[in-house]
């Protein structure tokens, strides 16, 4: 997650946000809970030293709900403890909970509650002092996001490079201008990335969405101009 302590304190250089997540709670469906606020006295598995532990503390304390944290060294250990019923709930990023549910013995017996108790903007980070590499990562991320907005896909990128009259598409695909040179890349850097991986929506669907076992909705990770809109917004290439 892109936080102030990691950015300003630890010195990571974040190149953007590729997934807007939030912390939630995974519980057994048999508990018939409507909200995590009903977990009074419950054992909640969290990873030691993570944002998850602090966020869970804040959530329950602000609602005057007593809970019993079960603190494990790793997220995997917390998931396994939940699977063994050593705790009543498992709290982590919702994407991690969705992944954890797929490896439980009976995934359909577990539900992610609707509560979202934190903001977790996830994205690539690079070491400080390598501005050129940070620019490559940042603008490659923006290129695949912009490609989705402009209707450029893995399948049609080659045809659009030859046929499109839209100057935004032509700049993106390296037909007009030489924007890649600014980051030490070839003119076709964005075209090559899109051909290799697809646009942002295709990457999302394949790894997190309808084509993956997680089957997560786009939610906040929809394009800004979608209906309903999300927070994904590609910076202009010009």
Can you say where each PLM-predicted feature lies in the sequence?
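Acidic, polar ligand-binding/catalytic clefts
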Residues: 1-38, 94-118, 233-236
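Short helices/loops that flank or line small-molecule/ion binding pockets
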Residues: 9-13, 37-38, 58, 75-91, ...
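Bilobed "Venus flytrap"/periplasmic-binding protein-like clamshell domains
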Residues: 20-77
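Extended ligand-binding regions for polar small-molecule ligands
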Residues: 29-33, 37, 42-43, 48-51, ...
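Alpha-helical elements of the RecA-like P-loop NTPase motor core of helicases
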Residues: 53-54, 80, 98-99
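C-terminal functional modules
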Residues: 175-238
């Amino acid at each position: 997650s892109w936080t102030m302590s990691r950015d300003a304190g630890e010195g990571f250089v974040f190149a953007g946000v590729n997934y807007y997540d939030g912390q939630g709670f995974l519980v057994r469906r048999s508990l018939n809970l409507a909200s995590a606020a009903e977990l009074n006295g419950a054992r909640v598995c969290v990873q030691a030293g993570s944002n998850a532990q602090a966020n869970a503390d804040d959530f329950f304390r602000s609602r005057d709900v007593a809970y019993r944290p079960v603190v494990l060294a790793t997220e995997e250990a917390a998931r396994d403890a939940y699977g063994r019923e050593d705790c009543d709930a498992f709290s982590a990023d919702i994407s991690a909970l969705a992944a954890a549910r797929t490896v439980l013995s009976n995934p359909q017996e577990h539900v992610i509650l609707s509560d979202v108790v934190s903001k977790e903007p996830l994205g690539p980070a690079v070491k400080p002092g390598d501005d050129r590499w940070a620019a490559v990562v940042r603008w490659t991320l923006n290129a695949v996001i912009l490609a989705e907005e402009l209707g450029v896909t893995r399948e049609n990128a080659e045809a659009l490079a030859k046929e499109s009259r839209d100057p935004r598409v032509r700049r993106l695909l390296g037909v007009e201008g030489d924007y890649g040179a600014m980051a030490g890349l070839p003119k076709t850097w964005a075209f090559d990335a899109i051909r290799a991986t697809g646009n942002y929506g295709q990457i999302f669907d394949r790894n997190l969405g309808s084509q993956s076992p997680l089957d997560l909705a786009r939610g906040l990770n929809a394009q800004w101009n979608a209906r309903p809109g999300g927070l994904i917004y590609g910076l202009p290439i010009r």
